[in-house]
Amino acid sequence: MKDERLTPHPDTECLTGANKCRVYFNKSTKEVEGTTIYEADYVEVDALTREDVIVAIIRTKYSLNKELGIRREYINNQQGAAEKWNGFCLFVEEAQSIANNLNL
């Protein structure tokens, strides 16, 4: 089954006083009776460090087990592993870019 969460959404919200940050993904809009409703999944990060935000974004698409499986396949030069690894790396770069924009 293909994972439709291709990229994290760049919207983030830092919750002042709570030392938390929300990173939104799968953002969409829909019209209900003439009103636009915004929907999004999000992950909440307990600490406001750059690394915590990056890992939280990565986990919106890749569980730790899935990430380790991709790494293992790549290390063992399995067929199709390079493509999966490149996709993972691109997602990590996008996560890093989002975290950098937060100026944490």
Predicted feature locations:
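A preference for well-ordered globular domain cores
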Residues: 2-104
